[in-house]
């Protein structure tokens, strides 16, 4: 059932408008972007994640994305990081039930870290080490690539069994699928490399396999890297072609990512102007028919409303702003946007903590 957030008429009419996906609808245009909270690996992590996400659903968020969960062991971020397995389905139901009880929707992010993994089994399209990881990956064989595609499909089916409304396939920020699409990291000479078309084959097949496993009434968000911001990254024609191909393959929504983790270009820090990358997201929106989500340095409902009203995007992704204030949407809807506890982009207790293995919190 679509639960509406109580709102004052004509305030943020575009931001708070429902979004029809055909088989289901989102109550507004706000997506809570994925962020690793550190709860994923804690003994009582599922119960604490349930409270965390349910609180944001109660605050009015239309659809939430979990922290990254790997589809297989090789793709996990660290030795003890989470993998989606059959024995965890009931535990994940604790999260989905809590969110649904508050009228929200939630999708599980499937994240294969590739060469960003911090364990001895890390794999990648080619044996090319990242400058931000002391560990070198092993290049996957053909059979392993095919198994990885199936692993994504199986993990998505388990997510559906656990009550998730869909999955987000993580294809940006320089992670595994992004590594396959870029010449920087994909030096293969077989059917998974050489040409741009071959390099984007893996994410396209992953989305198709997820759709095959989960059926037509399941949300598939594909997180696409709009700007890699690294040498040897994807060109704009490459990005546009990938967007079109994953749409055809079964994606319902395109969420956007800006910059690889190893990029030297700031993308979310305080000095980055608000909405600095919406020009690229508007360009992507012109290439596809499915909804496109704007991300990075969107901190206020006024800014979010304007970019949707101007046709730059169909939705907005808020991660840190919803860490700072879980009632961001409810306050905007009730005419109390001036009371929102606004994210200042300091990254000191969220991103810094995430990268040093501590619980994510907020300075504001």
Which ranges hold each PLM region?
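Flavin-dependent oxidoreductase catalytic cores
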Residues: 1-364
């Amino acid at each position: 059932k679509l639960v509406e957030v109580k709102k004052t008429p004509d305030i943020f009419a575009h931001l708070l408008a429902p979004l029809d996906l055909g088989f289901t609808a989102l109550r507004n245009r706000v997506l809570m972007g994925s962020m690793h909270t550190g709860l994923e690996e804690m003994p009582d992590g599922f119960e604490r994640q349930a409270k965390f996400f349910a609180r944001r659903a109660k605050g009015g968020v239309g659809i939430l994305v979990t922290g990254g969960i790997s589809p297989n062991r090789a793709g996990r971020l660290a030795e003890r990081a989470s993998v989606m397995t059959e024995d965890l389905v009931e535990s994940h139901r604790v999260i989905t039930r809590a969110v649904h009880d508050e009228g929200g929707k939630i999708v599980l992010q499937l994240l294969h870290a590739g060469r960003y993994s911090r364990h001895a089994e890390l794999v990648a399209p080619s044996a090319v080490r990242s400058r931000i990881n002391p560990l070198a990956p092993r290049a996957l064989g053909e059979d392993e690539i095919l198994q990885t595609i199936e692993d994504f499909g199986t993990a998505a089916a388990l997510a559906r069994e656990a009550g998730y409304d869909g999955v987000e396939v993580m294809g940006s920020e320089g992670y595994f699928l992004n590594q396959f699409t870029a010449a920087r990291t994909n030096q293969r000479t077989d059917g998974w490399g050489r040409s741009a078309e071959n390099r984007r084959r893996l994410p396209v097949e992953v989305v198709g396999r997820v759709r095959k496993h989960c059926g037509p009434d399941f949300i598939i968000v594909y997180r696409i890297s709009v700007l890699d911001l690294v040498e040897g990254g994807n060109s704009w024609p490459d990005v546009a072609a990938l967007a079109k191909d994953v749409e055809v393959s079964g994606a319902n929504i395109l969420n956007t990512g800006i910059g690889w983790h190893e990029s030297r270009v700031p993308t979310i820090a305080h000095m980055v102007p608000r909405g600095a990358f919406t020009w690229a997201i508007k360009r992507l929106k012109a290439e596809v028919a499915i909804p496109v989500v704007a991300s990075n340095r969107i901190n206020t409902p006024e800014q979010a409303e304007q970019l949707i009203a101007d046709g730059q995007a169909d939705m907005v992704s808020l991660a840190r702003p919803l860490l700072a204030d879980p009632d961001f949407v409810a306050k905007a809807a009730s005419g109390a946007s001036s009371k929102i506890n606004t994210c200042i982009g300091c990254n000191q207790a969220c991103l810094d903590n995430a990268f040093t293995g501590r619980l994510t919190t907020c300075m504001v």
